[in-house]
């Protein structure tokens, strides 16, 4: 098993070796006259965040971030643009723009190195995304160290990094995913439907690993201390995962909520990417009611990096409370 000392040394070396490239990219951005905070973010080494859940080490990697306009076309699609904009402004956010970030997670149990989702991979790199492997390297992990890859669901921003150059990106890994999710996406009935394009990605990136896959359902174990929970709606077999070690817990909520304001404060608002919008809304309320009631920490794939926090029940939904030093003491 890779040691903490080695990880820290490798992480420091990665930053040092990256420095000339950072300077080159920054210089190019400045010369273009169009440098933004996103340009700077893409030029820097990928952000990583490390903390412990009991004896388990958790490393969050920022695979990238993508700014977009017209948030009401993605979130609150059953609301007026004015209503969506007003909620954003009430939370000190612009009414006409939003940023979507992507946060795969690695959990080192001491005997297993488990990666949850793989980001956008090669297809995102021309836009400054797909930085998972780069981030893992900065954190002291090689692709070969990963023993298990868990796929929460099979949308492109979660499975895009499964393959690298036509070969498995994590060559020593076995794979775990939900049975219902896999069955939906490989079904030939998807051809000719809105899911056909997504199916192409699954057939290219997921199906080649089918012989190395373990399929689970609600309550299925990945390893001791990590349990799958059905959270259907965002996709037909969307799964979330409870991590527990030495009495500490963290729930990986994947895409149950995709925005820390628009999805959490208004869990009943429809989201364009939710495949079954009514089921997704019901799942949001169920999952975040549990987290708020039990005061459990969660990590959401699209929450503001490092994507970890808690939720407090408020009038119409939930308030996101970012992680501070709870896991450090």
Describe the residue ranges of each PLM region.
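Conserved beta-strand hairpin/beta-sheet module of binuclear metal-dependent hydrolase folds
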Residues: 47-139, 240-256
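Divalent metal-coordination and catalytic microenvironments
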Residues: 55, 107, 117, 146, ...
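Cap/insert and terminal regions of metallo-dependent hydrolase folds
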Residues: 5, 246-329
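Metallo-beta-lactamase
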Residues: 135-141, 145, 172-230, 282-286, ...
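Active-site metal-binding motif and surrounding structural segment of the metallo-beta-lactamase
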Residues: 96, 104, 126-176
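N-terminal export signals
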Residues: 2-3, 8-30
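Active-site metal-binding loops of divalent metal-dependent hydrolases
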Residues: 63-64, 118-121, 154, 180-181, ...
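C-terminal segment of N-terminal export signals and the immediately downstream linker at the start
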Residues: 23-59
